[in-house]
Amino acid sequence: MEELEKDKIERNEEMSEEVKGEGPPSELEQSEEVVEEKIETEVEQKKEPSLEEIVEELRKKLEEKEKEAKEYLDIAQRIKAEFDNYRKRTEKEKAEMISYGQEQVIIELLPVIDNFERALANEGDYNSLREGLELIYRQFKKVLDKFEVREIEAEGQMFDPYKHHALAQEEVEGKQPNEIIEVFQKGYYLKDKVIRPSLVKVAK
């Protein structure tokens, strides 16, 4: 009787052990399962795209680049057209300004020519002719002044190759070397620009 009771107790203990083994998974087991699922998910996400997908992606990128290139080309063409129009407009304005400037000079010189003709037509004496020529000279000088044309100072000045051209040299007592001692032809400025240098003789 005692042996039967002992066997029963042993079987109950074994069943208890089995029941314990079949209980809920431990935290370690749960963590391992989560890690395995995460790895499987990442592997699926990192799956290499197919050839068709690669081709489609490249086609889309190519279309985008072609669209950008067309936009840049349109911009470049518009800028070129605007620049061409600007260049033509400025060239026309420049030509008109030159033409207008020439016209103004001619208009200012016409009275000088008129007075020359009157002086030449005058059959009076030499003094009258001289007075007429002096009048014309003063009138012509006023025209030059109006257009900011000035004589270049030369005689008594030191030679300056930017304003003077030396045609001759001569030893002159009391004169410094390269001092201008004679002017063969006057030079002129237009504003601050030398439009004709003076032709001079300088001392040695």
Swiss-Prot record:
Q: Which Pfam families is this protein grouped with?
A: GrpE (PF01025)
Q: Which domain of life is it from?
A: Bacteria
Keywords, in A-Z order: Chaperone, Cytoplasm, Stress response
Know the name of this protein? Protein GrpE
Q: How does it assemble?
A: Homodimer.
- GO biological process assignments: protein folding
Skewed-composition ranges (Basic and acidic residues): 1-21, 36-46
Keyword Nucleotidyltransferase part of the UniProt annotation: no
Primary localization: cytoplasm
Cross-referenced HAMAP family: GrpE
Instruction: Give the function comment from the record.
Output: Participates actively in the response to hyperosmotic and heat shock by preventing the aggregation of stress-denatured proteins, in association with DnaK and GrpE. It is the nucleotide exchange factor for DnaK and may function as a thermosensor. Unfolded proteins bind initially to DnaJ; upon interaction with the DnaJ-bound protein, DnaK hydrolyzes its bound ATP, resulting in the formation of a stable complex. GrpE releases ADP from DnaK; ATP binding to DnaK triggers the release of the substrate protein, thus completing the reaction cycle.
Cellular compartments annotated: Cytoplasm
UniProt record similarity statement? Belongs to the GrpE family.
Disulfide links within the chain: none
Cited NCBIfam families = PRK14140.1, PRK14145.1
Gene Ontology molecular functions: adenyl-nucleotide exchange factor activity; protein homodimerization activity; protein-folding chaperone binding; unfolded protein binding
Segments carrying the region annotation (Disordered) are: 1-46
Q: Name one GO cellular component term.
A: cytoplasm
